[in-house]
Amino acid sequence: MARAKFERSKPHVNIGTIGHVDHGKTTLTAAITMALAALGGATGKKYDEIDSAPEEKARGITINTAHVEYETPNRHYAHVDCPGHADYVKNMITGAAQMDGAILVVSGADGPMPQTKEHILLAKQVGVPNMVVFLNKEDQVDDAELLELVELEVRETLDKYEFPGDEIPIVSGSALLALEALVENPKIQRGDNKWVDKIFDLMDKVDEYIPTPDRETDKPFLLAVEDVLSITGRGTVATGRVERGTLKVGENVELIGLKDTKATVVTGLEMFKKTLDETMAGDNVGVLLRGIQKKDVERGMVLAKPGSITPHTKFEAQVYVLTKEEGGRHSPFLVGYQPQFFIRTTDVTGKIVSFTHIQMKNPSSVAEEHSNKMAMPGDRIEVTVQLIYPVAVEKGMRFAIREGGRTVGAGVVTNILEE
């Protein structure tokens, strides 16, 4: 079937919902699509349509991530509903990289919870630049002063993780009451229902506060592969988000990382099930590759302009070691520690060859002679990492360190080391 063409008439922004489990992220996502559908800017999705999101296999863990699209009068949005469960933080690390901004959902009845903090920290580490807060379940809070206290606590928490807590817009409301009103009457307009109006207010704030990102369209093309599909009779499609640059049908690209670098030609591009002649930074796109077998491509490789990036196994980085309260390790680790490094969309085993301290959580508790042999939870360290496979690594790139299904550190590459 011939695909409709994707129209690029408004600025495009990638956002997502983050926050603690059961604080209402999915309900809010549904309410936003239904409210904007009433204005003709979306296809309304009910809660169960988003909640039963297609399963994505990430390293043996099945993760559901819902992608929905909608428009406000000013912009086109692609919205990811990030799973809130602590085990799904992996996807936050690969998925939150897909966000130009986030809507942090906090239950007004409960206030910030451990995962709220973990998601704010991760948003900082994976480079989500801006967020707007939705204080949900307002209908369950009888006392306006309590809601103000929760708002204050949210602002303090944001400050702690170096977001501008005083400036960030906070909108309170009830996603559930808005959604129920919209399910009952899908044509609700502004001014008809106070709960639905709060959803419109939230989207106004998202429009105003989350800047249209400066797309990195002038840099050389790069896409981190998230998934690979085989289309009978057409070939192999690599999907992912264009990190930078632009790409036209017919151009040459290289597949880099994990295996030997391969050169290929782009024979087609698709976005939201529509064909494109050209894709640019920020798009979630499928790239059809000539002469490439499905087995040649895997999650974690990058597609890039030939010669623009090379694979490496050794680099220096600055790393923050999470405390146990943040879900990290309970005990220190030593030189020679071998965790998993999550780089763009890949996890690769690597070894910490050496480290020096930048900032110690409890300087007095560790004897001097141990200080550069032992990294304690809460420390900030400069490390040298040796990966077992080469991947496309570059200066300024962020990554997470994982062990046994949990995030134990977050870092940024400061220097590439030649072998």
Swiss-Prot record:
Biological processes annotated in GO: mitochondrial translational elongation
The residue ranges of the tr-type G domain are 10-214
Residue ranges for the region (G1) are 19-26
Question: Nucleotide-binding among the record's keywords?
Answer: yes
Q: Where is this region: G5?
A: 174-176
- Where Mg(2+) is bound, by residue? T26
| G2 as annotated region, ranges | 60-64
Q: Name its cellular compartments.
A: Plastid, Chloroplast
Binding positions (GTP): 19-26, 81-85, 136-139
Reactions listed under catalytic activity: GTP + H2O = GDP + phosphate + H(+)
Q: Which GO terms describe its cellular component?
A: chloroplast; mitochondrion
Keywords for this protein: Chloroplast, Elongation factor, GTP-binding, Hydrolase, Magnesium, Metal-binding, Nucleotide-binding, Plastid, Protein biosynthesis
Which segments carry the region annotation G3?
81-84
Q: Which NCBIfam families match?
A: EF-Tu, PRK00049.1, PRK12735.1, PRK12736.1, small_GTP
**Which family does the UniProt entry place this protein in?**
Belongs to the TRAFAC class translation factor GTPase superfamily. Classic translation factor GTPase family. EF-Tu/EF-1A subfamily.
Q: What is this protein called?
A: Elongation factor Tu, chloroplastic
Taxonomic source organism: Tetradesmus obliquus (Green alga)
Q: What is the lineage of its organism?
A: Eukaryota, Viridiplantae, Chlorophyta, core chlorophytes, Chlorophyceae
